[in-house]
Amino acid sequence: MALRFPRFSQGLAQDPTTRRIWFGIATAHDFESHDDITEERLYQNIFASHFGQLAIIFLWTSGNLFHVAWQGNFESWVRDPLHVRPIAHAIWDPHFGQPAVEAFTRGGALGPVNIAYSGVYQWWYTIGLRTNEDLYTGALFLLFLSAVSLIAGWLHLQPKWKPSVSWFKNAESRLNHHLSGLFGVSSLAWTGHLVHVAIPGSRGEYVRWNNFLDVLPHPQGLGPLFTGQWNLYAQNPDSSSHLFGTAQGAGTAILTLLGGFHPQTQSLWLTDIAHHHLAIALIFLVAGHMYRTNFGIGHSMKDLLEAHTPPGGRLGRGHKGLYDTINNSVHFQLGLALASLGVITSLVAQHMYSLPAYAFIAQDFTTQAALYTHHQYIAGFIMTGAFAHGAIFFIRDYNPEQNKDNVLARMLDHKEAIISHLSWASLFLGFHTLGLYVHNDVMLAFGTPEKQILIEPIFAQWIQSAHGKTSYGFDVLLSSTNSPAFNAGRSIWLPGWLNAVNENSNSLFLTIGPGDFLVHHAIALGLHTTTLILVKGALDARGSKLMPDKKDFGYSFPCDGPGRGGTCDISAWDAFYLAVFWMLNTIGWVTFYWHWKHITLWQGNVSQFNESSTYLMGWLRDYLWLNSSQLINGYNPFGMNSLSVWAWMFLFGHLVWATGFMFLISWRGYWQELIETLAWAHERTPLANLIRWRDKPVALSIVQARLVGLAHFSVGYIFTYAAFLIASTSGKFG
């Protein structure tokens, strides 16, 4: 008999029902559960899949470059970045009639195209790319890297090239390699690219391989570096009248600390960015030489952790046992990596709009909105994943003997205190915030808006003032003209910062009021509740008073049968599942807030946000309803327009989202009966009965149906908001 899917589980392969397919897909990446898995093979599989991941990333970015070079308008966009709409790629659709062809033929194209709202044009322009040939070259190079990654992944699965377990567990060497080799060297290389290619490019000098060694990035070359006169590299920066991409108003500095934004491009100074990457490179190159490898010098991670005795003995045995616990658990390591990456991704969202690094991206409002929303959603999924793998660690890898009385064990010991405090914070935030919103709603409804409860966010305003925002009149630190910090700031460090903070044309420290105070606390409610569910799921993953033997049932189980009441919905997987709904909900509020605040800022009517955001009806009517009008108008009696694709996606997103509830609410028996009826009818229908199943059709398990429901809910939710966001922003600002 031929080997049936899944090959990694003979038990599943012999299952006579369709469960074989679904469980096979569900456990395909759970290497630990596969037949004949050893620790060595587990690490080698993970290592090889990393190369596969890299290959996919390189292929994807190569595709972006290739399609823009082939079907885009990069060269004409470069000549006029503020007025030419960047094209992502062409559209070929046999359904398009003449009105559709006309509606989607934009940006100087000959036929229908998609407009790029990803910011790649601004990114490539900023780093020195100027022609389609440059884009093709980049696409080919990334294609080559993709192939190299695939070969490397295959190679490391061959017997001769398989790394050993000890190699994977050599934490110090890996730290040194990642810190110095990846972060340090790549940051240094990026500084080199910025100084040698991007900065000359911004000054009208086209540097490529043919003239790379002839064009000096700085008139004095390496002289100042070797003579210690590093300040020369900061002298004569670009002037405020500099036209990006030309020599007009250009300086000669390569590493500066100007602060603020380039007046024409509204983005950070390239010379500041180069300086930043050089500093990062230096820090990481040093950090990557701190840990002890085969040379016998430097820190040992284990010694560091063991030596750390908490003051006053308040934390038991501190970090003893942690080194081996973390180093022997891929789930713990993945949890830490995901937590870090999730936070970084959210920080990217926050900083890409407030401190834009790419030329002219700040004036492309739809791109700004799309990138913020994109990075916040990605961050949400990554962060929830961190807790999921933390819970799996507690179930599969945690050893109570090894961690006696250390910080990890003590977390588990006082989990009731942690969970109840989080619960209290969530309840407090929820009831008070909702109470204020609803009170204000009622006052508006009764025609007495002056009776609203409006709270000024004075602490946040004070913090903004301390950073130099003068409009609140706090007169403190950087907003006080008498303070030493203010005076030093005018000359020594970041002279452009204070101008940028107090200019109302950017997104640095936006003016905040009672509406911001309320939505801030609504978001805090969402964050605390999501955290509560995730933390409880992880801390109760091994067991609870209700179910002390929970860890024996694994990460995802529906219930312990009918004889044991109350054991449904309490697996660690169920906590993750519930938390994802809250995560999506919270990011919904975050993106609504960001988008509405910015739409009113860009349109010059900030009072609309300030007045309408203090009560729920304001959000529903003046943000959601008012801004969905363009969407609902995508198709009308006069034909169609370029927003019609978003109108369709808006409807389709709602459909996918609503489909999710079909899986989330109906139970298993209902589907089993329906499937059996359909199978009966199928087998008795001419032509249809020529096709038979090899597997007996059975309904999804409870956990699987929840996953399918959650996937539809998430995808539909994000599709719907993406269509709303892009249509409402591009409909207003082009």
UniProtKB/Swiss-Prot annotation:
GO terms for cellular component: chloroplast thylakoid membrane; photosystem I. GO terms for molecular function: 4 iron, 4 sulfur cluster binding; chlorophyll binding; electron transfer activity; magnesium ion binding; oxidoreductase activity. Its EC number is 1.97.1.12. Keywords: 4Fe-4S, Chlorophyll, Chloroplast, Chromophore, Electron transport, Iron, Iron-sulfur, Magnesium, Membrane, Metal-binding, Oxidoreductase, Photosynthesis, Photosystem I, Plastid, Thylakoid, Transmembrane, Transmembrane helix, Transport. Chlorophyll a B3 binds at M662, Y670. It catalyses: reduced [plastocyanin] + hnu + oxidized [2Fe-2S]-[ferredoxin] = oxidized [plastocyanin] + reduced [2Fe-2S]-[ferredoxin]. It is found in: Plastid, Chloroplast thylakoid membrane. GO terms for biological process: photosynthesis. Phylloquinone binds at W671. P700 is a chlorophyll a/chlorophyll a' dimer, A0 is one or more chlorophyll a, A1 is one or both phylloquinones and FX is a shared 4Fe-4S iron-sulfur center. Its main location: plastid. Belongs to the PsaA/PsaB family. This is Photosystem I P700 chlorophyll a apoprotein A2. The lineage of its organism: Eukaryota, Viridiplantae, Streptophyta, Embryophyta, Tracheophyta.
